[in-house]
Amino acid sequence: IADIQATLAFARTENLPISIRGAGHNIAGNSLADGAVMIDLSTLRSVSVDPVAQRVFAGPGATLGDIDHETKEFGLAVPTGINSTTGISGLALGGGIGWLTRRFGMTVDNLISAQLVTAEGDVVIASATENPDLFWALRGGGGNFGIVTRWEFAAHPVSNVFAGLVVF
């Protein structure tokens, strides 16, 4: 977090735009901007599971595969997308539709909280009870409200799931 705050302060001082890269899944390179300082979060892939509370905590660079790998040991799943290389940050900030959406809702419906660094460098928590307007904005509103440094999601018990595409 200190590195992010220092980078934001430098960019402000030098009047430089910033760009944020989550897991780097987007093939169009939307996290790139000419002349900008990029904050690359792709190595922040930690995932921890609290099986009793049925909560998952993920770093901003975690992929859906990272999350699935950690939750399956406990028979839990977070409703995410369909591609294991997709980053949780881009997916959650965009809404998140996947195999479990019909049963448990979109990814953002299962977001409990997000820790983020604001443009001013402040570390805040956004949840239904703490900074609720910011929480509402994060839930599908894109990545322009701060730099998320930790996600907290509700996880759900699941048995074996068979899913795939049928092509004729």
Segments predicted by a language model, with ranges:
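Soluble FAD-dependent oxygen oxidases
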Residues: 1-168
